[in-house]
């Protein structure tokens, strides 16, 4: 995890983010300091890709909720902290109201983290607690290494799901379900012949 020493506000960070290495794609703002995470491997992208397809199907059926990808969520001010979970699912406000933003202070109903690198794994417990304290109802942690998903609903015991188990979003996304193994399935075009 690399960092720079200049303290920024969330808005300054959003303005400068695309000037950072990799367009700031793997950068977060922690107490005003830019922190660059390790670029994830293909298994991270594959899990997000597969979840994106499932959420796309859900969005076509669901009249209110929608997903945002790599949207910065402002979790603290003075000094500012902006975290970028892989996926955020919103049920409140205008449909797709957060979609075109780089950062927002609106908290989603569901946050999806992907534990694909050591630096992403290191602070997961603290991040989950923070999400719940800020009103996020459900946190999923996708672990591409063990091919498991940890589903942590606020105020409830964490649930660990493996291939063959069904991932559900309960009241957060009514009717959503996905067999866990589908998250880790390689696309047919990816497979070597």
Predicted regions and their residues:
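Gly/Pro/Ser/Thr-rich low-complexity, intrinsically disordered segments predominantly at protein N-termini
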Residues: 1-193
């Amino acid at each position: 995890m690399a960092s720079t020493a200049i303290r920024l506000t969330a808005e300054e960070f959003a303005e400068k983010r695309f000037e950072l290495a990799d367009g700031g794609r793997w950068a977060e703002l922690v107490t005003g300091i830019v922190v660059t995470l390790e670029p994830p491997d293909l298994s991270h992208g594959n899990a997000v890709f597969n979840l994106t397809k499932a959420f796309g199907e859900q969005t076509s059926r669901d009249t209110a909720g929608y997903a945002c990808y790599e949207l910065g969520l402002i979790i603290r001010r003075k000094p500012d902290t902006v975290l970028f979970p892989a996926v955020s699912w919103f049920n409140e406000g205008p449909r797709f109201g957060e979609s075109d933003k780089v950062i927002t202070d609106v908290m989603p109903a569901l946050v999806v983290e992907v534990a694909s690198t050591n630096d992403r794994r290191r602070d997961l417990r603290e991040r989950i607690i923070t999400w719940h304290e800020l009103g996020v109802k459900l946190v999923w942690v996708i672990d591409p290494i063990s091919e498991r998903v940890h589903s942590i609903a606020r105020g409830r015991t964490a649930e660990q799901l493996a291939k063959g188990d069904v991932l559900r979003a309960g009241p957060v996304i009514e009717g959503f379900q996905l067999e866990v193994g589908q998250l880790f399935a390689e696309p047919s075009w990816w497979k070597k012949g």
